[in-house]
Amino acid sequence: MNTEEKKQSRLTKKQKRNIIIVIIVLAVMVLADFVWSNTYIEVKKLSAHFDNLPEGFEGCKIVQISDFHNEWGKGYIDRLTEKVKDCEPDYIFVTGDSVDQIFPDVDRSLEFMKKLPDICPVYLVMGNHEYNLSQEEREQFVAGCESYGVNVLYNEHTTLTRNGDTISLLGFDNMENDSEAFSQVTEDFVILLNHYPEDCNYFSKTAVQYGTHIDLSLIHISEP
C-alpha cells in the first residue's frame, strides 16, 4: 500500500469513528430527553368556581393522580410524593391505571399508594389496566390499597365532609350497576371519579334521570 492509500485508509477509519461517536452522542441525547420527559413531574394548578359549592368547601384543595402505570422506581415515587405533599391537599383522587397491564408491578404501585393516606384522605377508582390484570394481581392491588387506608370505590356513592358541610362523591369503574349509587345522592354538590372520558356524557344523563347532576368530573389524564 503506497503512502496515498495509507492516508486514505487512515482518513476512512477516522471518519467512521466520528460517525459512530456522533450516533452514540445523538442516541444519548435522545435517551436523556426521553428520560427527562418521562421522569419530570409537572404540577398543573387549576381553580374552579361553583355557585353551589358549600361554604365549608371554600378553598378546598384536590390532587388528582392518574395513569401511574407502576413505571417508576423509588426515587421517582419519593419525588412525586413530595410534590403531592407540597400541594397541601384536602383530598387525593386517583383515577385509574395505577398498575400497568403489560408490565404489571403491583408491589411498586402499592409502594406509592401506601404513602398517600399519610397526607390526606385518598379515594381511588380503577381503570382498564387494573381490570386487565390477572384476578390474583387485581385482588392483591385492591387489598393492599384498602389495608393502607385508600378508599377504593366500586360504582358507589360516599360523602365528603369539611367544616361542617357535606358533598357527594361518586366513583365508577364501569357503566354497570350505577343506579344504587345515583339513588343515594342527596347533596347539592356532586363530584364524579371515573377513568374513561367517553363515559362522562352517559353519567351526566344518568344523573339527571335520578334528579341530580354532576358538578365536577375527574377522569383519565395522560400523565401522573
Feature roles, as predicted:
Residues N52-L53, N70, E130-L216:
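Conserved catalytic scaffold of divalent metal-dependent phosphoesterases
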